[in-house]
């Protein structure tokens, strides 16, 4: 019981094995054994037994000897147990040392049967050890801080033997060396599993204390010489020194000259050696490298000459972007990321159409501010929303027109040229500039629109004899695109008078002939009707549904007299084709700008009702199913007969009507 009390000051993870129990695990750093592995690993983790490692080997060899005297056992066991608890307790009492002696005796008894073979050797060594270890060394070892010995001992896993020459353990060195040499067989049978390392391993492993001395160079040269020469020369040297290692005759090979890049030429061995420059020092230092390579330079030199230079131009060129102006401007990131000699052929083909679009975008940048300055605040907001460029629908961006909308380019023209000439119908100069802008950007569409331009030009000249004759006549291809469906108050007043004067009776006659509901004065500004018709004629020849209407309009345009050409054409185009054009315009305008954009078609209805109110009443009963509510709502707006009021009422109802008209008008076109 007193022994247990004496053990109390030790840390709980450091409790040694109780004396009477057989041990399962033995700490490889200290003489303690325990039944729980965690205690032993805590020894490793916290470095609790740093000073006892050398003593553990002695204890395995000496203390566990059955034939040693009790005094002989006490003294060597006193040494390890005096040293081992140093990290835990710096001051050890005599009682604790006695308890440690008893623990050592128990271990010696348990290991008795293992040591019968090693009796004579171990007895000799124990006697010498007892003589050579005075108690002063034990006391000094107790007071010694563990960190000093830990610095000397690089690792707990290195077996301690003849190479432990430093510290206060210098006294024990001859005995330890004799122990490790003489009873080698007995040592390995007695030692624990952690120390059962063969002596060849200990002798072969060079300790870190002597790492800076001649032991390491001794092993390096044999290792290099043991390698087969071709293996060493082929893998190690040519990768680094191949340009210098060839004879001059082989370096003048055509193979090297073919693959050598201008960056490599200074490294070719022939100019260096011919000019008297010394060869690189890494080759001069180990002399065996030349000896190894001289043996095998007949066969592998082709491989050195062939493969190494091919790598250099690949990296030198692969990391540089070839100085193609188009690549350096825009696609430097792409060309750097991609292998430069595989892709650059495909880059120009991708870039040239983009450059064409960039030219168009630059032209638009030059020309689009001219109408934008003339537009009011609402048209400015629309100019942000819509893209005034030919070839792109309102849903596409000016840089990248959406390819799905190429079949609806006429719709795109509607919304776009809405923008370019929206509020410019009252001023001829404005329309002229916008016509120029459109002509520049719509050369791709002129072939389609040119054949329809005479009809529209005649209509424009007759309806706008004072305003547009000088503008529309010189620009045949531009005239259909000059159309503004956004009516100003002045234009409305002009065409209210015109429609009231001559179009009322004629329009009634034509309404009887043809489909009533869209018998609207789409020609708010005289161009709006043509805008729908022009864009429709660009669109509908591609669509089978309304192509006969298209031809019918041409014939009527040609045979109608000049004075009534505007209004008769406005009524004739109110057939199914006009329904299609209204659907087209509403689809285009509703997608491009939600607030104002349905002007072209809703102004048709509203202005039809304001200009010719007597036409509204025959129109409502004859309205088609798709336009019933539009007619009903249109009758509500017939009360405002003044052009200014009609415009304000249109603005009020546009946001409401555009969505419903969009849905109503879209259905027959989709079906």
Swiss-Prot record:
Q: Name one GO biological process term.
A: epidermis development
What is this protein identified as? Zinc finger protein 750
A molecular function GO annotation: zinc ion binding
In the UniProt record, the gene name given for this protein reads znf750
- Which InterPro entries does UniProt cross-reference here? ZNF750 (IPR039363), ZNF750_Znf (IPR039064)
Function in brief: Transcription factor involved in epidermis differentiation.
- Primary subcellular site in the record, as a coarse category: nucleus
The scientific name of the source species is Xenopus tropicalis
Q: Where is this region: Disordered?
A: 66-87, 366-433, 592-671
Q: Does the keyword Transcription apply?
A: yes
**Zinc fingers, CCHC-type class:** 25-51
Q: Name one Pfam family in it.
A: zf-C2H2_7
Q: Which GO terms describe its cellular component?
A: nucleus
